[in-house]
Every structure is written in C-alpha cells, then in structure tokens.
Amino acid sequence: VKNGLYENVPAPRVKEKKVFQADPLIGWTTYPLSYAPVFVSRTETDPMSEENKYSMLVNVTEDIANHPDALILNRGYYGMNLKTDTSYRLSLFLKSRNYSAPVRVFLVDELGQQVSNVIEVNIENRDWTKYTGELKPEKNVQRGMLAIQPMSKGQFQIDVVSLFPSDTWNEGKSVFRKDIVQNLKAFAPCFIRFPGGCIVHGVNEETMYHWKKTLGPIENRPGQWSKWAPYYRTDGIGYHEFYELCEYVGADAMYVMPTGMICSGWVKQSPQWNFRHIDVDLDAYIQDALDAIEYAIGDTTTKWGAERAKNGHPAPFPLKYIEIGNEDFGPVYWERYEKIYQALSAKYPDLVYIANSVIRVVGRENDDKRKDIPNFVNPKNVKVFDEHYYNSIEWACEQHYRFDNYKRGVADLFIGELGISGKYPYNLLATGAIRMSIERNGDLNPLFAERPVMRHWDFLEHQ
C-alpha cells in the first residue's frame, strides 16, 4: 500500500537496521551517479529517539560550488506521480554535525531537472529539528523525485522525510489517497483484514506485528523489516489508521493477532537462517490482544479506550472479527489457540474468532481442511476456519465443486487468501471458478478476503 493507499510518496525513511537481504537505504541515491562529492550511509549515532534508532548520514566531502548539480534523490516507489493541481506538504528532520549552511529541497523530473519551487532551510542546530514547507509542481511528472541539495562541505543527518499531497481523503486530514479510498468505497467490502498475512508473524519475534508500536507520531514509530522485500514497513498505516480506513469505506474490521509463532514456511524452507518456532510468554500475547481489543472498542474510562480517545476517536471502532494467528498450524498452534480463544471470548463474547488452517498438505490438497480440528481442539471453540490457497490455474478450475462436499454444521468457511498463478486473464477466470463454488455454498456462511486488493504494477509478488 505504500505510495498507493498510504500516500506518503517518498520511499521508506532510513531507520531500521539492515535485516536479511533488505537495503536500509532503499529509494535513496546521490546524483550524478558517475561522480558526486555527496555520500549517504545509515548511522546509529545521535538517533532521534529510543524508538527511532537509525538515520541517514550525509557527508559532503568537497566544496559544493564546484559541483552545482550534486543532489540527494528519493525516487519514492518507482517514481512519484506529481501533478500541477496538487501541492505537496513536506516535512523532514535534520541535524547538523559540522554543517552550517542551507540545504535546498525541491521536486525534479525523471532527468533530475527542477520542476517546483524551492524550500531552503538552514542547518545549524546540533539537535534534531523538524522543518516543514509546501512544494508545488510546475508540470505533471509521472516519475518524479524529491531532491535535497547541500550547499556546503560538512556532515548532517536526515530522518523521517514525508511528502503528502494536500488532497488526501477526508479533506486532506487523513493519510489515505483520495481516489483509492473512493474506489474502495465503491467496491463496498463487508470487512477489511489487517494487518494481513505474513506481516503478522514475521520471521522472528522482533519482526512480528506489535500494534502498540504503530501508534502516535510517525517519527516515534520504529517500523520494521518486511518479509515482502525490498522495502521496510514505516507503519504509517498503523493500528489506529486501519480502523479509520474501515470507517471511511463502511467496512467491519478484522484484526489478525500474532500467536508468538513465526512463519511456518520459513521454518521449513530456510534452515540457513536458523528459523524456528520460539518459546514465548503466551500470557503476554493474550494480554496484548486484550489491550488491542480494548483500544478498538473499549469505553473511554479504560486505559486503552482513553488512549484511542486521546488519538482523536472517543467512539468505538467497528471491530467485529479477531483472527488468531496467520497461517499458523500444528499441535503448538492449537494449544495456543485454545488458550487465546478462552481468554478473549470470556471478556469479549460478541466478537467472531477465526482459526487458521495448514496452507497445503501434499497429497491432501482436495481434502476438507476442517476434518482435523477434533484431533487438536474442541470443535465448538472453532467458529470460523481460515483457509489459504496458492496454486495453479488448472488446480483452481478443478475446485469448482470443492465446497459442495464440505460437511455442514462444522466451522464456517473463510477464504482469507487466494492466489492463482498464471497468465492474465486466465488466472482471473480460474479464481472465478472458486468464487462461484463459495457463493453456491452460502449455507457455509462463507467469508472471502480479496488478496491483494491493490498492488503497485512495477513491483509484483505472486504474479
């Protein structure tokens, strides 16, 4: 959703340590590429805050007067679509090390030519200082960039660069792109599943989704490495913004909570990283989920309900579903599911709780995945069962009658993720075969989550 639904157009800010294969400076470069006396790197020195431990160090090594075209560029997500009828609200944090001169900030086109007014700020403060301004393009540019131009030799630090169009949804008061929210409203989803799939469990406890770290000012949100490289999560769409989006489009909210289990696929397929299911304090995860629910629907006299009100929303949010884990399965999962379900449903019995299923068992692709539930847990405690499918066009077409054979009176059906690989438009037609089977079996009370609802066409996963 970056540079799409969440309309902060620069690429991720430079904060997180390098994790696995991701580049912490993704989106940033210096210009001209052949030679420029301007160098950028990630630094841990003098961070903005305890939450925000990393920033970008700019080192200008020569007199910039001899290199008037030297720039630091942020290309956004494969280029910024700049429009003359929109102004762009700039904010960034700067800190001098030994730099005492202005820097100029402006927009450029694909060739690096200036296409907007210039915001000039003096960097003399050795403390982190926030600077703001407004940039207005002079022409439409499909793949523009944000340019930062040093004016002197020396070193300074940059962090949390933000560039929002002034016409976001809700009269510019939200972080959401107006036309996409309007399209979502027209699509009229009954619910929105958040934060989604693999973001929930990550590949270790650090990279799991921790909702409390996504609240408050963006500069205090640490963000996190994303399994879907090449970029990091900024968590600009945090836990609070998720519920705002649900309200904007008239959808119920489905929050997917972590169970303390990491991505089972990585445990199985990536032994070189020593991924393994870890021992965690399950009571802490249960309390965290209870806090999350309280933030969403708790009275303002409660701790987290009061926090929601402090963040501008005293009324409860439209939370209806809690999914316990994402693609977690096996005896360990069911043991945790039972404990989590008992604790959450005891306090919030009106919410709908959803269990996970194994993604794929070779040789049993056509089985009713729910038939193993009694082997692990009381079936009465599984009200809705989430099945995920990633397979070929041929397989999808064979599933047209799949749900006709499902046993009735068991858990309700939820297809939380469906990915059919193959060429367009045949993959869409094959997806339609499964959807027809779901609709034909309405007595299973089916739920279906589109995945993905949107994507950046220059960066496609699960093509």
Segments from the language model and where they lie:
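Flexible loop/turn segments at secondary-structure boundaries
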Residues: 13-15, 97-101, 199-203, 261-266, ...
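Active-site groove signature of glycoside hydrolases
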Residues: 149-151, 159-160, 165, 195-198, ...
